[in-house]
């Protein structure tokens, strides 16, 4: 179910959360990937434009947290980031971006953005390791050090695969790795302690 358009388009009442000193929202919705651990494609469908950055920023802060699930997978998301790179807004894209979608042009745009702290990516499978190395190299070319990279590492039942991905990421000195246990509440799969 979706919210009625007039409700969905309402600007949040941040006065309800006085400790929240940032704007929060989506520029794109959905995702074209069909990752087995992710519910977004079923819930939101394929990726599509959703808002412009001007529709979600606040005039009392320069902090903007984006919750897009795959912002680099749509030209609208990339264009919004390009425009944001020309502003003083400090970004946090709190969902992981795809390492496979970092081109030289995208790396240049990301390097011009102001970041609250990290640039976040994910490495959920071995096939993404080479993509991570490529993305890190392109970002370094444009002045972004590995210390600005935050990598979500999906932790699965396959410890051998998990460790291979972890050790591969540790080759990129300075990156921050966050182990994210696999869970699928729809199937009753919860992380083991």
Short names for language-model regions:
Residues 1, 39-135, 146-156, 176-180:
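Core AdoMet radical
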Residues 1-24:
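Glycine-rich beta-alpha loop elements in corrinoid/cobalamin-binding modules
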Residues 5, 34, 44-46, 73-75, ...:
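Short catalytic/ligand-binding loop motif for oxyanion handling, primarily in non-cytosolic enzymes
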Residues 17-19, 29, 57-58:
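Short, flexible hinge/linker loops that cap or flank conserved catalytic cores
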Residues 21, 33, 129-132, 181-186:
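Extended, charge-rich low-complexity interaction segments
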Residues 26-42:
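Local cysteine-cluster metal-coordination motifs and their immediate loop/turn environment
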Residues 79, 83, 134-141, 163-171:
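Alpha-helical scaffolding segments of alpha/beta enzyme cores, especially the outer helices
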Residues 154-193:
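Auxiliary Fe-S-binding modules of radical SAM enzymes
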């Amino acid at each position: 179910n979706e919210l009625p358009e007039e409700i969905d388009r309402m600007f949040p009442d941040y006065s309800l959360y006085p400790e929240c000193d940032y704007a929060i929202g989506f520029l794109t919705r959905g995702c074209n990937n069909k990752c087995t651990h992710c519910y977004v494609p079923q819930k939101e469908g394929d990726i599509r434009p959703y808002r412009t950055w001007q529709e979600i920023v606040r005039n009392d802060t320069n902090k903007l947290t984006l919750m897009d699930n795959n912002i680099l997978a749509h030209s609208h998301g990339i264009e919004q980031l390009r425009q944001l790179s020309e502003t003083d807004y400090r970004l946090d894209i709190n969902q992981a971006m795809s390492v496979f979608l970092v081109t030289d042009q995208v790396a240049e745009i990301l390097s011009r953005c102001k970041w609250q702290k990290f640039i976040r990516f994910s490495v959920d499978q071995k096939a993404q390791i080479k993509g991570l190395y490529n993305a890190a190299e392109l970002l370094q070319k444009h002045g972004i050090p590995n210390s600005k990279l935050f990598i979500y590492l999906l932790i699965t039942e396959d410890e051998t695969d998990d460790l291979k991905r972890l050790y591969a990421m540790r080759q990129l000195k300075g990156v921050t790795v966050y182990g994210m246990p696999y869970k699928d509440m729809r199937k009753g799969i919860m992380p083991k302690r």
